């Protein structure tokens, strides 16, 4: 079972808030799925506890599924600090606020507002490209340098076409990331 039930000791009323600190350790497995490492990337997604959604049907207590889109979560704001070895480039949810480095490590400070999840992927092999289109910073993280420029053009064209058809992209950044991921793709 992957559901943690916590007894609060008192009823939490509508719009009332509380804080809960959970300390835990995460060991990243050798896996080319959503969470794990492969030959080229370290995929750190779905890696922290989230609250079950309480909607008009009550608490949604569905467990994690390995196939399909098994996630149902509220949106949140994230303020994350990550300390990683300098050899890696990082693709992440949200906007980079600050970065500091020494000879061995890099400290990233990242914010993401009104998103359903916070994910990041590390690789020492990324070829990173950045362009801007319609006020959106477009980032591509490629494992094949020969295809890197084309991947960036396709990402830019996607933002332009979808913005015309469906309305302005609601975030300031859009990233496309190549990874060791057996399913073929995932949106975060």
Question: Where on the chain are the PLM-derived regions?
Answer:
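A surface-exposed beta-strand-loop module
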Residues: 1-40
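Hydrophobic helix-coil surface modules that form long, contiguous segments used
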Residues: 54-55, 69-188
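Solvent-exposed beta-hairpin/edge-strand motifs
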Residues: 1, 44-45, 83, 87
């Amino acid at each position: 079972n992957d559901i943690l039930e916590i007894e609060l000791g008192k009823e939490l009323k509508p719009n009332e808030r509380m804080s809960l600190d959970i300390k835990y350790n995460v060991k990243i497995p050798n896996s080319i799925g959503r969470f794990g490492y492969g030959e080229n990337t370290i995929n750190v997604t779905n890696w922290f506890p989230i609250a079950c959604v309480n909607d008009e049907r009550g608490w949604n207590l569905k467990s994690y599924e390995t196939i399909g889109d098994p996630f149902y979560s509220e949106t949140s704001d994230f303020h994350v600090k990550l300390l990683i070895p300098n050899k890696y480039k990082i693709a992440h949810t949200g906007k980079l606020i600050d970065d500091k480095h020494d000879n061995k490590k890099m400290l990233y400070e990242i914010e993401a507002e009104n998103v359903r999840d916070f994910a990041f992927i590390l690789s020492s092999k990324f070829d990173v490209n950045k362009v801007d289109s319609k006020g959106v910073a477009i980032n591509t993280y490629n494992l094949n340098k020969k295809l890197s420029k084309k991947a960036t053009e396709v990402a830019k064209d996607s933002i332009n076409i979808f913005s015309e058809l469906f309305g302005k992209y609601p975030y300031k950044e859009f990233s496309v990331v190549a990874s060791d991921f057996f399913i073929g793709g995932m949106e975060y």
